[in-house]
């Protein structure tokens, strides 16, 4: 019997394919996005050292109110602000296998507006 592939499995395969090609360094770390049904998380990661340099999510106390897309843009602004404070300006954007639309797009555009270059 033919079964429809699981959406999350397809996303994980896309993400693995992209991750094999991109990697974050200390000079140009990776801005990773994870999206759950309720929250969105963003991390700036140095893959060489295996360290998270900066992170932000909708669970942070600075983020409040609005739709999920508005919250995602607040997370993007917050992660960019924290990265710029640590003198990180250039990043590689890792959309985590998600389509560049909606919450992922809102986070990316807010991060760009607040000083990150990618």
Swiss-Prot record:
Pfam assignment, any one: Ribosomal_L18p
Signal sequence segment: none
GO biological process, one term: translation
Domain of life assignment: Bacteria
Keywords: Ribonucleoprotein, Ribosomal protein, RNA-binding, rRNA-binding
Region (Disordered): 1-20
Segments of skewed composition (Basic residues): 7-20
GO cellular component: cytosolic large ribosomal subunit
Subunit structure: Part of the 50S ribosomal subunit; part of the 5S rRNA/L5/L18/L25 subcomplex. Contacts the 5S and 23S rRNAs.
Recorded family membership: Belongs to the universal ribosomal protein uL18 family.
Record function comment: This is one of the proteins that bind and probably mediate the attachment of the 5S RNA into the large ribosomal subunit, where it forms part of the central protuberance.
NCBIfam families membership: L18_bact
Protein name: Large ribosomal subunit protein uL18
Name of the gene: rplR
